[in-house]
Each structure stands twice: as C-alpha cells, then as structure tokens.
C-alpha cells in the first residue's frame, strides 16, 4: 500500500499489488472544514494499523485502516476515522494575529505519545494510547512563536528538536529562537536550549524550514539563510558550520556514517556529502552539481543510489553508472 497526500484535497491509499496501481480509498479534506486550506503535505505515519496524518486544514486525523486480504489474496482496506484533533485554539489565533494554523509536516511518535506542529508555531503532544476508543488528549502544548514546516524530531529519551521559520517576526521568536530542544516532561518550562537563526537582508529570510537530522549526540540543521549547523544535543552549542547556499529547505539525511544534504539552491541545485567519522566536525567528501533546479524535498537512499524530486518537476536518481 502507498499512502500519500496531494493538492487536490485528497489523501489517498493506493494498492500496488494489482496489474496497475489502484486507489482503494481517499479522504477529501474539503469534507472536514478547518482553518486554512485543503492540501496534504506531511507523510502519513502508521502504527499498529492506525494512520496518523495532519492536513493543511489544521486537523490531525487518526484513522483505523482495517487492512486485510480479499479472496484472491489482494490487500484491501476499510478505513474509519477514530479521532480528529484541531491544531488551533483561540489563544493561538490571538497570539499570531492570523488564521494560518495549517499542519504541513509529519508527526513524531514514541511510547504512546504523538507530537505534531503547525504554521501557527504550536507544538502539541497527544496521548494516543486510547485512540481506538476515540480519545487522544493533549498532554503537551508549547508555542514557538512562528511557522513550523519541519517535522518534529524525537530522540530515545523523548526530547524534541524543532526547527522554526522566521516570518511573522513576533517578539516570541526572539524569546524562543529558531532551532530548539524541548523536554515534554517539563510542560511548564520545556525549553532546554535554543539557537537563533536571524534574518539576513529581509525580515523573512531567517529561520529553518528543513527537518533536522539527529546523529550521535549532534543535531544537523540546514537553515533558510544557507548555513548547515552541527549542534551539540546536550548543550545547544553550535560545534561546526558550513555554507550550503540560501533557501536550504531540503532535510539532511544520515546514511552509512555520512551526512547527505542538498546545496546551492539558487545556483541550479546540487548535493554534498560529509563524513561523520567525527560527528562534531563533518568533513566534505564530495560535492555534485545538479543543474536541474532547486531541491527542496528530502532525498531517499537505496541500493547505492540517491532518489529525489526537484523543483524543475523531474524525479532524479543519482549514483555510479
């Protein structure tokens, strides 16, 4: 089964075990009125036959898939929505001064807790242990002060790492910073550390859009102004930086002891790889020009190849011949 969203209002489930891909189910967000628009941006997450996905309408859905096989051995689904959680509240709307509270990232799940973020800067934790009974109470709530497109990153200890944009330039953005570590076990004072990513020339060219990559005691974050940062996860100290070009929206990827990141967005796009033999001091091992356009999507690596979509509308595979 393939699960994906679209800009035509629909989140789809498509079967790949037929002679050709076959749509089995779709949910139209226009039938679930929310607060912004009806796109689906994040990747669905599935835990024990339940799919969790937030939409740009600002609503998080928990959907029981009821997966099974028909008499011919083909997969089938009979989904039912268990819970819908609105990602906004009156306090958030008053604080940000607008109604942009869409969910544009994927969720993070650990030990029965689900975390999601939205464009109003809200970081929300839900207890999903009773979701099949229609319950998903809010157990954590933090306002970061600005738009969050990056997915929350969670470590083995339950700490959250959040990358935040810089668009509204509210006072809260100065208080909180743009790359932060949160401890949900301290709901009244969860901010552990923060790193500021200030604007360069305009009020909106600071912050971070890309989801950080969590390594061995180091968080790697690509920023909108064009810096790649290596941050100590314990202290928040910036250990190392490198220039990767403005508009760095593609999320870095760690694979086989290397960090892979899209670079040079305004110069035709490209990829760069760093050795993480010393996690605190990445060493560039190769740099490849793409030339086809800016890469904003996150690459996938499989069988020695890099697969990624580009802003020029093409899907690419890079690797040795």
Question: What are the functions of these language-model segments?
Answer:
Residues 1-41, 45-321:
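Extracytoplasmic/lumenal domain signature
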């Amino acid at each position: 089964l393939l699960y994906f969203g679209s800009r035509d209002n629909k989140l789809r489930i498509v079967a790949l075990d037929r002679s050709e891909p076959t749509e089995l189910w779709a949910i139209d967000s226009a039938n679930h009125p929310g607060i912004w628009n009806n796109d689906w941006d994040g990747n669905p997450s599935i835990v024990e036959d339940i799919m969790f996905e937030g939409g740009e309408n600002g609503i998080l859905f928990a959907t029981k898939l009821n997966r099974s096989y028909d008499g011919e051995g083909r997969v089938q689904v009979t989904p039912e929505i268990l819970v819908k959680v609105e990602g906004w509240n009156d306090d958030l709307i008053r604080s940000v001064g607008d109604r942009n509270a869409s969910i544009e990232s994927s969720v993070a799940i650990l030990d029965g807790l689900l975390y999601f973020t939205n464009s109003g800067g809200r970081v929300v934790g839900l207890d999903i242990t009773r979701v099949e009974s229609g319950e998903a109470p809010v157990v954590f709530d933090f306002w970061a002060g600005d738009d969050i497109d990056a997915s929350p990153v969670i470590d083995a200890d339950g700490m959250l790492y959040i990358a935040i944009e810089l668009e509204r330039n509210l006072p809260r953005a100065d208080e909180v910073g743009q790359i932060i570590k949160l401890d949900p076990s301290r709901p009244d004072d969860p901010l552990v550390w923060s790193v500021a990513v200030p604007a360069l020339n305009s009020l909106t060219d600071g912050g971070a859009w890309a989801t950080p990559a969590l390594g061995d005691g180091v968080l790697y974050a690509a920023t909108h102004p064009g810096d790649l940062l290596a941050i100590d996860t314990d202290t928040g100290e910036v250990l190392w930086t490198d220039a990767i070009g403005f508009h760095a929206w593609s999320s870095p990827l760690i694979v086989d002891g290397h960090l892979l990141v899209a670079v040079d967005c305004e110069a035709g796009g490209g990829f760069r790889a760093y050795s993480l033999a010393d996690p605190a001091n990445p060493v560039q091992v190769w740099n490849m020009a793409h030339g086809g356009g800016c890469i904003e999507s996150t690459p996938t690596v499989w069988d020695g190849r890099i697969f990624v979509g580009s802003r020029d509308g093409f899907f690419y595979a890079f690797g040795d011949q």
